[in-house]
């Protein structure tokens, strides 16, 4: 049978004793009034429940008196004591610590007793007690020594603990000091408004808090408490504070937008308000006026854009828009200088105008491709002259290649051959394309392809011969000039 509460003992809540003790210490001050209001709010509901449920819970007793009994363990008997503590005996004259008794903690009456507060709570109380809500480190030391004489004779390591809490704890942050203030070295420290409620909860958990004004005092620091009235922003959320501004995580926005693009519209219609829609967060303008959602196009517009891009890539070279770059799907044809010149020349030539205006049939493409292949060995001008004969084209090609051998080799020798191949790949669809790969290999290529390859090989050999001749001429002239210089010197 467990211990029974003696009849002389009456259940007494710890909060009422705390408020009575602090009201005696701080009589007539704002601390006692604020604490009394806080206690009235906290303990009014439990008192009502005790009064209403007194008849129902007659067998249940309040256990707040158990920690006041010094001989509690001895009342269980020696066997229980041996099982609980076989080595250490309980001392009858051990004074209860102020953190575990109903007597209020008074630093003046018990100067040698360590206060039941963590260093973060001490720093919090010191900063909140200042009128500007900002203090340097030395003023925090002085406040702790003034209100808690225990630290006057304590080892000096407590100052290091204060500094470590200021620098490592996220609840405290540095504030730039004003020019008018003369605090010497160091910077000012204040409470981060995001973590102020956490410090208040930690201080409430301590049994005796001598400064309850921090629970009801509104913040007065304009720089440190600008967003206290706003919603709490927790660490790791999509919105985080940096230099007093709300920012949005771009990685999360991109991921949400991609997920939404893959979501069918039927599921999107069932999204409640506040959920990501159209790739952007639906935010309340009153809470976050500075944050704007990212403009993401709807799914239908995105699909139309994709179709437009594919159609632009599949456009044949006989229908380029005037002044627009040629979009090619072949990476080997990514040469801006050759494609731009050829597109401009085709847009101005009568043949290209007639072909682009007419219906783009396979025969038109084939005629245009054969004409372009006959003049494929043309120079750096790159224009297709469909009304000239092949002999005139070869003479012009020789003239231009002698003037600009590098451009002719780069433009007509490389780009034109790939263009001709692309024309045949796009314009002509041989019936053998639908056959399997093995049957394609057994069939013979058409004669037109052989002729085209022969012409291409001939033009390349012709250009290579011109190039070699030019190299020989330049080498001979260079040797002759060197010999003349040597003879003149001798």
From Swiss-Prot:
GO terms for biological process: craniofacial suture morphogenesis; mitotic G2 DNA damage checkpoint signaling; negative regulation of DNA-templated transcription; regulation of DNA-templated transcription. It holds the Pfam family Forkhead. Keywords: Cell cycle, DNA-binding, Nucleus, Phosphoprotein, Repressor, Transcription, Transcription regulation. GO terms for cellular component: chromatin; nucleus. GO terms for molecular function: cis-regulatory region sequence-specific DNA binding; DNA-binding transcription factor activity; DNA-binding transcription factor activity, RNA polymerase II-specific. It is found in: Nucleus. Residues 113-204 bind DNA. Residues 338-361, 372-383 have a biased composition (Low complexity). Residues 384-409 have a biased composition (Basic and acidic residues). The keyword Transcription regulation applies. Residues 1-21, 86-108, 315-458 are annotated as: Disordered. Coiled coil: none annotated. InterPro entries: FH_FOXN3, Fork_head_dom, FOXN2/3-like, TF_fork_head_CS_1, TF_fork_head_CS_2, WH-like_DNA-bd_sf, WH_DNA-bd_sf. The keyword Zinc-finger does not apply. SMART domains: FH. PROSITE patterns: FORK_HEAD_1, FORK_HEAD_2, FORK_HEAD_3. Acts as a transcriptional repressor. May be involved in DNA damage-inducible cell cycle arrests (checkpoints). Interacts through its C-terminus with the C-terminus of SNW1/SKIP. This is Forkhead box protein N3. It comes from Homo sapiens. The lineage of its organism: Eukaryota, Metazoa, Chordata, Craniata, Vertebrata. The gene is FOXN3.
């Amino acid at each position: 049978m467990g211990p029974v509460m003696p009849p002389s003992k009456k259940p007494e809540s710890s909060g009422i004793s705390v408020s009575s003790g602090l009201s005696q210490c701080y009589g007539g001050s704002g601390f006692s009034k604020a604490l009394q209001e806080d206690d009235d709010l906290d303990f009014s509901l439990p008192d009502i429940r005790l009064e209403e449920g007194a008849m129902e819970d007659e067998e249940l007793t309040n256990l707040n008196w158990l920690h006041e009994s010094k001989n509690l363990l001895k009342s269980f008997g020696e066997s229980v004591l041996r099982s609980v503590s076989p080595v250490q005996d309980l001392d009858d004259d051990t004074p209860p610590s102020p953190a575990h008794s109903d007597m209020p903690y008074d630093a003046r009456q018990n100067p040698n007793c360590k206060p039941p507060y963590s260093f973060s709570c001490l720093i919090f109380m010191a900063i909140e007690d200042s009128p500007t809500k900002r203090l340097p480190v030395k003023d925090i030391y002085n406040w702790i020594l003034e209100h808690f004489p225990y630290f006057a004779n304590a080892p000096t390591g407590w100052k290091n603990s204060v500094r470590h809490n200021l620098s490592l704890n996220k609840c405290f942050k540095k504030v730039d000091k004003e020019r008018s203030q003369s605090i010497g070295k160091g910077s000012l420290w204040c409470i981060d408004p995001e973590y102020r409620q956490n410090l208040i909860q930690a201080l409430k958990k301590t049994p005796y808090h001598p400064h309850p004004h921090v629970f009801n005092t509104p913040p007065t620091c304009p720089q440190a408490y600008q967003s206290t009235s706003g919603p709490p922003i927790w660490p790791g959320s999509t919105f985080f504070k940096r230099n007093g501004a709300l920012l949005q995580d771009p990685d999360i926005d991109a991921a949400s937008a991609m997920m939404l693009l893959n979501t069918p519209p039927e599921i999107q219609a069932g999204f409640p308000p506040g959920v990501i829609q159209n790739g952007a967060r639906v935010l309340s303008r009153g809470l976050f006026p500075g944050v704007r959602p990212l403009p993401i196009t709807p799914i239908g517009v995105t699909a139309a854009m994709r179709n437009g891009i594919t159609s632009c890539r599949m456009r044949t070279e006989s229908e380029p828009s005037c002044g627009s770059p040629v979009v090619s799907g072949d990476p080997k044809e990514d040469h801006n200088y050759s494609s731009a010149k050829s597109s401009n020349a085709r847009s101005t030539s009568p043949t290209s105008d007639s072909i682009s205006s007419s219906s783009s049939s396979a025969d038109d493409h084939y005629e245009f491709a054969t004409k372009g292949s006959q003049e494929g060995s043309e120079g750096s001008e790159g224009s297709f002259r469909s009304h000239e004969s092949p002999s005139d084209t070869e003479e012009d090609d020789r003239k231009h290649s002698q003037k600009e051998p590098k451009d002719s080799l780069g433009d007509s020798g490389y780009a034109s051959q790939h263009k001709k191949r692309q024309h045949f790949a796009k314009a002509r669809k041989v019936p053998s394309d639908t056959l399997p790969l093995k049957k394609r290999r057994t069939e013979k290529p058409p004669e037109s392809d052989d002729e085209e390859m022969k012409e291409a090989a001939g033009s390349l050999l012709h250009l290579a011969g011109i190039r070699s001749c030019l190299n020989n001429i330049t080498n001979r002239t260079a040797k002759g000039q060197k010999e003349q210089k040597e003879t003149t010197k001798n």
